[in-house]
Every structure is written in structure tokens, then in C-alpha cells.
Amino acid sequence: MITPITLAALLQRFFTLMQQRQASPHTISSYRDSFRQFLKFVQQRLRKPPSRLTFEEIDAPLIVAFLDDLEKHQGASVRSRNLRLTAIHSFFRFAAFEAPSHSAQIQRVLAIPSKRFTRTLVQFLTRPEVDALLAAPDQLTWSGRRDHAFLLVAVQTGLRLSEMTGLKREDLIVGAGAHLRVVGKGRKERCTPLAQSTLAVLKAWLREPQRGDDDVLFPSAKGERLSVHGVQYLLTKHRMAACKVCPSLKEKRVTVHRLRHTMAMDLLQAGVDRSVIALWLGHESVDTTQIYLEATLAMKERALAKTLPPNGRPGRYQPGDQLLGFLNSL
């Protein structure tokens, strides 16, 4: 009699292999969250704890039911649905080598297609909305000063959420050519220059008593790295406060990615070339040599000089369809 393959054993080997192959922490956490969500659904559907599930029970109809539940009952977007399916497909490609006797089951799962979706126009904040958001935190409190610095850096640099929460104090380089050193997707290192106003706020923030031992630039109240939920909480909190002086924010959801788009639009409005914007946002390969990093930093500093600081007066610019398509691809 063939002993059934447990799902737990396969999943553990799958994530161990990801770590051994040095997959990015972002990919690992995304796949982890996908399977957490999936296993909660399976537990409710099959009424079995995840540790007792066999691989054979995870078939295509069950996965399709999970994907449908994401959209119909959990309010997930098509992109989120496809992201969860990507994680499941990756696991089943691994299982094809670990459990070849289940090849028919595996092929049926791998045949589940991603959904097509209509790309919407890029959403970003206007200058008055940005100014209202930056003014919202109460800077008489520790958390307010942290949030103000966090928002200012996000707006001025266009860093990704994982890049913002992963910043260390040592990543802030002050003095001549002040910049943030960032390791983005694919472990590509890049340098993002800082405006003088942003640098002044960060210098003041560094003088605050450090919380925790992890040297995180923007820690939680417990001194730990901010969670995704924690970041969205502070963004929503300050958006609601900013609505009092800028009512248009009531109709917008503020996320770190939307602030990233806002920075990209600021650069476009300043006439910065799209190739430089892509380089700024980490969408171009960055050589790890110091010479290339310094050259990249100088190019970005010239781009930064063309933008306006918060409270500045923007110019008028109407991007063409190709530019909007470029922004949508970020």
C-alpha cells in the first residue's frame, strides 16, 4: 500500500528549497501569505486541519473554488487572484518532481489559467493632496514624527512598500550626495538622492531615541519592522485627517504604491526622461560596482533638481498615451 503524501511535508520542502535558492524575501512572504489564505479556505471547506491534509486532496476543483471565493466573497481583485494562483502554480511545478505519481492531478492544476483584466489608468495624488497628507501627522508625538518622515520619504523617493519597511538607519547616507541605499526586487541595489528638505527631516528623526535592536529606520512602537497592515493603518489614519483640509482625498485610497506613482508623475511633469524614471524606481538593471552606483546617483540628482519640493507650485503637463502606459507598467 502506497503511503499518501502529506501536504505539510511537501510545503515544508518547497519553502526550504526557496530559501536555499535564495529567493527574495518579498517572494517568500508573498507565497507564504498565499498559502495561509488558501489553507484557511481548505480547512473550512474540507473540515480538516492543514497538518492532516494529503496532497491528493488539493485538486483543481478545490483550487478553482478558492480562487472564486477570493473574488466573490473576499473582495479580492483579479490581480490578487492571479497572484495567489502564481504561488500555487509554483508549488505544483515543484510537486511534479517530488510526486510524479500525481502527474495527472498536477497537470490539471497547472492548466488553471490566469484571468485577464483591464488595466486602469494610473492613480496618483495631486500636489494639494500630498501637502495635506504630509501635514496630517501630529509632530508633537513620536509616532507623528515617524509617520511624517515616512510619508515624506515615500513621496520623494517612490520606494516600494517592502523597500520602505526594510530601510535601516545605515541605509541613510548623509553629507555630500545624501541618498538612501536601497536593495529592491531581484536584489538590485540602487541609490536614491534626497532633497534637502527631506534630508533635514531625516536628520532630526535620527536624533530620536532608537527603539528596538534591529536598527530599523521607521520602526513600530515596539521597535520592530512595520508590518504591511501597520503601514496601511497609518496611511488611512492620516488620509482621513487630511480630508478635513483637502476633501478630494475622501475619494482616494492612499497606498505606498500610489505615492510611488505620484513621484513618477512628478518626474514626468518636470520633463524627466522615462528611462531615468525607470532607473529611479528600480526597473532597470543596476551594476553593483561603486562607479556605476555613483554615476546613477549623479543622474538621479539632476532629475531631482528638476522637481518641486512639497508646497511648491507645479507646472502644467499633459502626458500622452504612451506615458500613461509606461506608468501603468510600473
Language model regions located:
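Conserved catalytic core of the tyrosine transesterase superfamily
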Residues: 1-330
